[in-house]
């Protein structure tokens, strides 16, 4: 388990808390593995009825820790990445997933919400999917799930322009159940989670199975992953990551490949 992910079982709710607030809860490979361990534990343990994701500090998560991500991409090019393992576990989760989101939810911090059955946002929440900014493509089946949820043009705006949307807009777009004051966020999410623990677990899983096309989600996750890995090897991606490391704006004016 990662020191930056706290795992706690409370009244049938497995609470997974991101605890790297000094880095805006940016996700490392170890953190992804810890989250996957939690999801796999939930699937195998009948006493766990619901999984709740939350983050310490003023951000839910800044997405990938890019330095860690780049290092892993070089060293594990032929292996299943921790991020991919987590995304696969999200896609096949049969138990209710709930998210409590405050501040920034960047990249996977937003796409993972598409796999959550209930999403509660603090008034400070901002959702952002800046994959194209890094010369990459969407992941977590979001290239299918997001347009299906909010429509093509709004999804394309989020992907291609990479601009954040605020909590009110996210709620109106169907990406969340409620917007609440930050001080009430965790209480609201936990109350919903506890309510679900009292519902018949079999009926909840059967309902989720009817609502989600698990096979299509799994296939899209693989398709995105293959294209994602291809994009990582392009000059555009190398320029994007170099610009990030050098704290400058990337220059994509050269011919791409």
Give, region by region, the residue ranges found by the protein language model.
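C-terminal long alpha-helix characteristic of the crotonase
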Residues: 21, 120-125, 176-223, 229, ...
């Amino acid at each position: 388990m990662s020191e930056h992910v706290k795992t706690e079982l409370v009244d049938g709710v497995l609470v997974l808390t991101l605890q790297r607030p000094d880095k805006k809860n940016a996700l490392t490979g170890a953190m992804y593995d810890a989250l996957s361990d939690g999801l796999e534990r939930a699937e195998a343990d009948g006493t766990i009825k619901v999984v709740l994701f939350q983050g310490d500090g003023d951000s839910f998560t800044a997405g990938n820790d890019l330095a860690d991500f780049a290092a892993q991409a070089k060293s594990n090019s032929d292996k299943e990445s921790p991020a991919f393992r987590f995304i696969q576990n999200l896609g096949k989760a049969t138990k209710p997933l709930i998210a409590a989101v405050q501040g920034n939810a960047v990249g996977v911090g937003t796409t993972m919400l598409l796999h959550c059955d209930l999403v509660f946002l603090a008034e400070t929440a901002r959702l952002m999917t800046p994959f194209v900014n890094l010369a990459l493509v969407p992941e977590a089946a979001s290239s299918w799930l997001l347009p299906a949820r909010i429509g093509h043009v709004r999804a394309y705006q989020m992907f291609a322009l990479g601009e954040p949307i605020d909590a009110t807009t996210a709620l109106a777009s169907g990406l969340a159940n409620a917007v609440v004051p930050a001080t009430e966020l965790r209480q609201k999410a936990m109350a919903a989670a506890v309510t679900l623990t009292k519902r018949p677990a079999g009926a909840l899983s059967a309902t989720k199975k009817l609502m989600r096309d698990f096979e299509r989600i799994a296939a899209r996750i693989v398709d995105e992953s293959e294209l994602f890995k291809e994009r990582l090897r392009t000059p555009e991606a190398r320029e994007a990551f170099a610009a990030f490391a050098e704290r400058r704006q990337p220059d994509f004016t050269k011919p791409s490949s």
